[in-house]
Design a protein with these regions (language model features):
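Core catalytic alpha/beta fold that binds nucleotide/phospho-ligands
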Residues: 1-120
Length: 120
């Protein structure tokens, strides 16, 4: 069996706010982490990069064809996502890690589960 693998790392920064309208769908929810929404925006962008890398498709519009399902941002976790560009309409389980300087997202299989934050 063939595994789909994608990974993306995005440096922390405010520039993501300026381009959010190009990749955020109206039905995607932004959640705050440590009192700001930058982390959520970065995770959405990075996750969509991962999805694109795992798709065998061209002309993918990140806003129209890729959707991140609602999740609560934690230091690390996973969340479901879907693509609407291909005939297969793949579902993804995006895993992520927050670091003070960057976010990292990856996907190895097409599993579908729920995000749960670790509680201290």
């Amino acid at each position: 069996p063939r595994s789909e693998v994608g990974i993306d790392i995005e440096q922390y920064g405010q520039r993501v706010h300026k381009v959010a309208h190009k990749y955020m769908r109206p039905d995607e929810l932004i959640s705050e982490y440590q009192g700001e929404d930058t982390w959520s925006l970065l995770l959405h962008w990075s996750a969509k990069e991962v999805m694109f890398k795992c798709m065998d498709a061209s002309e993918v519009d990140f806003r129209e064809h890729l959707r991140i399902m609602p999740f609560q941002v934690c230091e690390h976790g996973e969340f479901p996502a879907e693509e609407y560009r291909t005939e297969h309409k793949k579902k993804f389980m995006i895993r992520y890690l927050l670091h003070p300087d960057f976010v990292m997202t990856w996907q190895v299989t097409s599993a579908y589960s729920v995000n749960e934050c670790d509680t201290p």
